[in-house]
Structures are given as structure tokens and as C-alpha cells.
């Protein structure tokens, strides 16, 4: 873990070097604070749900999206934790994210290839239904 001061220095240094900056947050409060650093992407996932197969609630998704947009519309929002299929990806985008994280949902699956294809299908359906995700 980093202190806030260390995190700020690391973000500024990464930007100086031309690196993309992705930060993770647990709550809407953290999302809002981290959004002030203007990362390229904020990966939002309740820590308690990581690896559980349980997805974040629609309320959580909407709260983090609104918190980030209150600071900047230029930050890519990724909703993670519990994403295991195309419907989970669809719901993340429906609730304002541009993408969804699903590492344990893929790696723990019996057929990871099929899960990836299902997630891509959910993404395609979501961008057809919610074209506003493209900023």
C-alpha cells in the first residue's frame, strides 16, 4: 500500500513518463478522490466482492460513476468484482461504465474461452443498447 502522498507522486511521475494510469477504488468516496488525480482509468470494485463471483449492486455502480463524472467525464470507468458472464458486463455498461473487469471470472471458469466469448457478446449488446459509453 501507498500513502496518499506516495500515490500522488507516483501518478504524476507516470504521467511525466507518458504512461497510462489506472487506479483502483473500493467506494464512491475513493473514486471521487482518485478522480481528482485524472487517471486514464478508474477500476471500481468493492474489495469485499473480489473473487467471490458476486457482482457489485446497481446502486454501487451508479454511485461510483456519478462520483467520477462529478470530477471528470474523461476518465474511463471499469466496474469489477464478480464479473463472470456477458450479463455482468452488460449491466456494468448499462450503469455507466465503459468496461468491466473479469479476471477471476475467466480464470476460475471451467471453460475460460466460452466465458470470454460470452463477455464479448455482453459488451456488444451493451454498446448497441447504450451507445453513450463511447466518449
How does the language model describe each region?
Residues 13-21, 67-72, 125-126:
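CE4/NodB-like, metal-dependent polysaccharide N-deacetylase domain
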Residues 1-5, 41-54, 95-116:
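Glycine-rich phosphate-binding active-site loops on the catalytic face of alpha/beta enzymes
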Residues 7-16, 56-59, 104-135:
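C-terminal helical cap(s) of enzyme catalytic domains, especially alpha/beta-barrels
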Residues 1-34:
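Hydrophobic, well-structured mid-protein blocks that either form specific transmembrane helices
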Residues 39-66, 70, 75-78, 84, ...:
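Glycine/Thr-rich beta-alpha phosphate-binding loop at enzyme active sites
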Residues 11, 31, 65, 89-90, ...:
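Generic hydrophobic/aromatic pocket-lining and core-packing "Φ" positions
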Residues 23-38, 77, 82-100:
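Catalytic cores of alpha/beta
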Amino acid at each position: 500500500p501507498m500513502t496518499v502522498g506516495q500515490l500522488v507522486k507516483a501518478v504524476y511521475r507516470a504521467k511525466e513518463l507518458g504512461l497510462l494510469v489506472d487506479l483502483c477504488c473500493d467506494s464512491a468516496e475513493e473514486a471521487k478522490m482518485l478522480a481528482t488525480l485524472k487517471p486514464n482509468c478508474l477500476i471500481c470494485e468493492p474489495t469485499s466482492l473480489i473473487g467471490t463471483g458476486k457482482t457489485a449492486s446497481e446502486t454501487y455502480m451508479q454511485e461510483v460513476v456519478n462520483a467520477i463524472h462529478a470530477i471528470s467525464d474523461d476518465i474511463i470507468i471499469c466496474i469489477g468484482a464478480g464479473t463472470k458472464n456477458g450479463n455482468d458486463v452488460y449491466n456494468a455498461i448499462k450503469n455507466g461504465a465503459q468496461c468491466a473487469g473479469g479476471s477471476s471470472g475467466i480464470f476460475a471458469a471451467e471453460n475460460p474461452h466460452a466465458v470470454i466469448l460470452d463477455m464479448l457478446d455482453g459488451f456488444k449488446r451493451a454498446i448497441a443498447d447504450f451507445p453513450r459509453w463511447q466518449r
